[in-house]
């Protein structure tokens, strides 16, 4: 982002850097609606611009909490990365601004809400739904990796659902620009950590491949594959890629998950191979056929009335 302001020691005056439009905003330019979510450092609200009535989500973060939590540089990195990403399966960061006490991120609004809430209600997703989401997240991460961005914290809590039912990656707090492609920082969520992170070894963009393998399992089963009450048992299972499938997980899905949850990062299948996998392609074709049939039946029903 050009002319990117520092996150700390921001001026008292309300101002904004809007590379997309070059305009200036303050919180007074928005009508604030219902809360969409709450985090450790602030909350997210549905809002709309007073001019044009354009719906957005505004993440309101308290500077004092960011500083005391030592995450101001993480936020700066999140803004830098997300402002440069433009993909249908990634939440857009439109702009940001601040006042004396708060920082405001103006984000794309995802009316379908949070993925983990849908998963909690559904218990688990159908194969066609899980396959569709897997295709979308693989496409989004492929785009990120081409830009040397590693997400490092893929999990249902960081995913949202758009107006057409599409998956959207919504949180880039742990992501990094990694042109060198080697990192050693421990980050992310325990159940989704790959063996190389648990072992404290160098890691690359292959961490995201492991994470979507865990995600696919959780989509289909309702819980992650390495979940144990004892943290040491979770880590041991991750290091050995040791897990079992319930009978409900079919052969095709097992094949894909097994190609992603591989201890050796170099041996994991690529994101393009995920998109082209026979289980994903077959499930998506079946979903399209079912939707077409529903449309035909609905039109026939309307004609008969």
UniProtKB/Swiss-Prot annotation:
Catalytic activity, reaction form: L-seryl-[protein] + ATP = O-phospho-L-seryl-[protein] + ADP + H(+); L-threonyl-[protein] + ATP = O-phospho-L-threonyl-[protein] + ADP + H(+)
Organism annotation: Caenorhabditis elegans
Keywords recorded for this protein, A-Z: ATP-binding, Cell cycle, Cell division, Chromatin regulator, Chromosome, Chromosome partition, Cytoplasm, Cytoskeleton, Developmental protein, Kinase, Meiosis, Mitosis, Nucleotide-binding, Phosphoprotein, Serine/threonine-protein kinase, Transferase
Subcellular locations according to the entry: Cytoplasm, Cytoskeleton; Chromosome; Midbody; Cytoplasm, Cytoskeleton, Spindle
Effect in UniProt of substituting residue 168 to R: Reduced in vitro sumo-1 conjugation
Stated name of the protein: Aurora/IPL1-related protein kinase 2
Residues in Protein kinase domain copies: 30-280
Main location: cytoplasm
Family (UniProt): Belongs to the protein kinase superfamily. Ser/Thr protein kinase family. Aurora subfamily.
Positions annotated as active site in the UniProt record: 153
Binding annotation for ATP: 36-44, 59
């Amino acid at each position: 982002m050009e002319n990117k302001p520092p996150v700390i020691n921001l001026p008292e005056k309300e101002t904004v850097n809007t590379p997309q439009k070059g305009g200036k905003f303050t919180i007074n330019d928005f009508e604030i609606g219902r809360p969409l979510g709450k985090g450790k450092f602030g909350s997210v609200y549905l809002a709309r611009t007073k001019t044009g009535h354009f719906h957005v989500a505004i993440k309101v973060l308290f500077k004092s909490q960011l500083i005391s939590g030592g995450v101001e540089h993480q936020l700066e990195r999140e803004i830098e990365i997300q402002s440069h990403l433009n993909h249908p399966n990634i939440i857009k960061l439109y702009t940001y601004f601040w006042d004396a006490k708060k920082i405001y991120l103006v984000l794309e609004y995802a009316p379908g809400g949070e993925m983990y809430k849908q998963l909690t209600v559904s218990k688990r997703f159908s194969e066609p739904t899980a396959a569709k989401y897997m295709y979308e997240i693989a496409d989004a991460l492929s785009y990120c990796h081409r830009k040397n961005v590693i997400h490092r914290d893929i999990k249902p809590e960081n995913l949202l659902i758009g107006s057409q039912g599409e998956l959207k990656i919504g949180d880039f707090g742990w992501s990094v620009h990694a042109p060198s492609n080697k990192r050693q920082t421990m980050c992310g969520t325990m159940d989704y950590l790959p063996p190389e992170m648990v072992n404290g070894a160098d890691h690359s963009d292959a961490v995201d491949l492991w994470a979507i393998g865990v995600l696919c399992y959780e989509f289909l089963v309702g819980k992650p594959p390495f979940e144990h009450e004892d943290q040491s048992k979770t880590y041991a299972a991750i290091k050995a890629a040791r897990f079992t499938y319930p009978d409900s997980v079919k052969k095709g899905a097992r094949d894909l998950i097994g190609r992603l949850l591989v201890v050796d990062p170099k041996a994991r299948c690529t994101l393009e191979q995920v998109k082209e996998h026979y289980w994903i392609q077959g499930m998506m074709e079946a979903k399209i056929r079912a939707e077409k049939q529903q449309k035909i039946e609905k039109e026939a029903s309307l004609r008969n009335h």
